[in-house]
């Protein structure tokens, strides 16, 4: 551990998603904790908003306020601020300060006045913005108190916690400030709405576009934070260009994202996990498809994509086009393989499709009936073997009661249907306008019997409480064969990295931070199970063809080749461990400590 003495710096990491799960930054902060604790020890502390529902599950208050963080919390409370100090209940158990944004809502008028008066940052009455500004004001007070007691490096993540930075600099509070943008706010909006985003990036009028999308206050905070930080960072080389043209500052360094990688000592361990979870996916697939038509599960591969519903940004459009081409090619080649493709995202729905639930219930009834018949046959066969002098195998049907024969027949009769398996598992609120469904219907990729590519669109995240899968998302990933994430806009991209960490091959794109990092730092990455689609230099049609080629190559692998590739992917995961990537963070902190206060 490098920093241990009371004279060495204290690191404060401030994030809206510390002990408050909203999106991907929660994964960044949480997974990094063990490596941060190992390096910084007791001089590391997080700051996040107090959200009672989240805190009830993940926060444990302390009675010990003897360290500098605890003392600063007591002083802040004495000023009338509702704040808590304790432990975040995640791996590493770091110290954390939680501050209730609502305890400063009575000061919002004054906060907004001075933001405009001193920094020309406009505001609105939007609820999230009010919370962010109130939280920021209290964070500024906390840091001002803490900076009187110790040397402090304060690392702010994203615009939601960026509002204190301009005033910390204006008031010359003795703190070294690092600010990280994980994705520029304007970049995300422009990429979703402008097909020529990357070509026109150099000529964007940020203020005009921010007003157009009604996000000028947030973008103004982001820009002020970027310019006010002693050290400005972003998560990938892909977003560096965005920062230059949309925030008007070149990042000082890049902080790539990692994971807390759990390596297996023996290769067969993660292979066994793949088989275990694949069997659970088999069960769902049998219930969903076999009612209409069966196919050979030994010749079936499971592909998936997941993430927030941004049809174009996440590359759902490219994935669908490539799947349609793959289906055509496999049919032309008379392939005996089947691809089941899962789209796991979040869209508004009324309920799970009753037909899907009914099919699952019938499948369970078939299983119960077969188990009962198996038990009855087993017991009677054992008795017959023990008492009979004949060594021939008896007629097994004779050991089944008429009741079970009738129930078996009726169950099978009620099971079979001539309807096609639904492509979507839920009743969507926007069924007619949903972009995934529109593509599937218009291209007739609707689970026809002769389709080699079958679709399961699951508009809800996978969790153990989910009645269709009943498993963790990470278990689902391990049970699949390939993750597909050819994003158009993705500052980093955790989903393919999660695949790699699970030993599952993945498709990414060179427009994502992760894909760009892979191309620049890993030799022969395709051989190691990471396929990078060249979207930067190619148009949509060429990229779709390249993706279809990769998918077909994977389908045509034999089982031994797939296992070998999973071994190579799992071997690659170590280079994305936070213990390897933390050096980038330490470089940023050393850079901040070496800057002058002015």
Where are the regions that the model predicts?
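Catalytic cores of nucleotide-sugar-dependent glycosyltransferases that transfer UDP/GDP/TDP-activated
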Residues: 1-598
